[in-house]
Amino acid sequence: FGGGQTERQVQLIQDFKPDIIMVTPSYMLAIADEFERQGIDPRSSSLRLGIFGAEPWTNDMRAAIEHRMGIDAVDIYGLSEVMGPGVASECIETKDGPTIWEDHFYPEIIDPDTGEVLPDGEPGELVFTSLTKEAFPIIRYRTRDLTRLLPGTARSMRRMEKVTGRSDDMIILR
């Protein structure tokens, strides 16, 4: 689903009855608004799971989506430079941060100023090396995203904390 024609998106959900939706979290709230504008209880839709990414979102947004839509809401992390949205996704059982798909990517956290590799649990810049990409492999790609690597919970692969900022954030004063 795209960011436009929200009325049509609600109609498509009603007609095709999907179980899962993958949009930005802010657009899911717009879809909930449109359901309500049409006099339809969003919780009555066929949706059971929402996969949300492409923008930062808070735990309050997650709670609002889950309450208003009656679905589970999970986070997905990705970069178009690395392989699109499929780099890490949250486990529906724990919802405690995206689990990195370490069978495809080798994650590291580095000091953004020195490039020094930091141990798991330390905050720093997320770096990825692709392990299975053949035509255009990525080696130690600096994402500029600030986070921490944490032990896995639902699976054996490590998970990442929500991105807390960017190493190249700046404010321009005029």
What positions do the PLM features span?
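Active-site glycine/GP-rich loop and adjacent strand/helix microenvironment
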Residues: 1-174
